[in-house]
Amino acid sequence: GGGYSQVIPMEDFNLHLTGDIHAITASHNLTAAALDARVMHEKMQDDEKLFNALCPLDKKGKRKFSPNMLRRLTKLGITKTDPTELTTEERSRFARLDIDESTITWRRVVDINDRMLREVQVGMGKDEAGHEHRSGYDITVASEIMAVLALTTDLKDMRERFGKMVVATNKRGEAVTAEDLGVAGAVTVLMKDAIKPNLMQTLEGTPATVHAGPFANIAHGQSSIIADRIALKLADYVVTESGFGADIGMEKFFDIKCRYSGLIPQVVVMVATVRALKMHGGGPKVVAGKPLAAEYTDENLDLLRAGLPNLERHVQNALKYGVNVVVAVNSFATDTPAEVELVREAALKMGAMDAVVSTHWADGGLGAKKLAEAVIKAAEKPSHFKFLYPLEDTIKEKI
């Protein structure tokens, strides 16, 4: 946040916090390391050596399958549980993932904007001669592990989801997962504390849970289900944010998060600003670090009016789900009374249950009091929430 509407302590919030992102980095890169090592060892060893390395003799001179290995056997359609009973062909199928290297999608991650690592050549050591290949680094929060963290409901569920993460396909076109690599359990252990939401507060002492942050463009863009469930046990009203606008973040909130969690919203709070609507109306480009153009600092009702269809489409998207909509006009100091009133009146005509000007950035909680009252009033009205499609439909039908 910013101004008088922010979560504190800001320095802890932005610098490590409780280390959730670092746990994701370690978990993701562990998977990448296991993937590269598996490819290398399968090239260097025959089936028997691979099998013996995966299922070594214990102190009593016997081999035993771990629970993870039994899951892999089940996936392969092998019902035997004694390693000594497997045929030569079954041992080969069990031990060899036979990964098609051109299909590997699991790169490494780092929580630094280091552009020189975006594309790299790995395996350059003398012990890895002949195993060099191109790879790269992505930003940590883009990891699928972050998306899983936000969708999980408990440790068991998280363990199962980690096991289903696809890292590549084999030469038969079948998915190779973290479960196949044997790392899903280790990843879960590394994430055992990250599954716990972080409790922080606003400048005025309102509790705020901070947990997970998958991107809305490549993942689903929501805070965690666990954080929402805990918050609902502690407060009368819970406000949870979805990334981006009603055309992506809100739809993923409904289509993905609500389906998995079973939580149904009573109200959609649609945030709009005069500045953004002027941009949608054809205003000049806003460049970071440069002064705003006069169109954004002076009253310009025509430009603002031209951008209102954008807000209308967002409101319509929300109303399709049968949920009451309250438009929050997030007012800046440069907005004129005529401009904010134009947005407010237009929002009501679009079908919003209410539209309220909010000055929380400048005035804190007092500046958002009328908005809060409008949201409470809307929450007391019946909500007729519905999903727009059943999961059984084809992708084409859903779209």
Predicted regions and their residues:
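Flexible phosphate-sensing "switch/lid" loops adjacent to ATP/NTP-binding sites
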Residues: 1-399
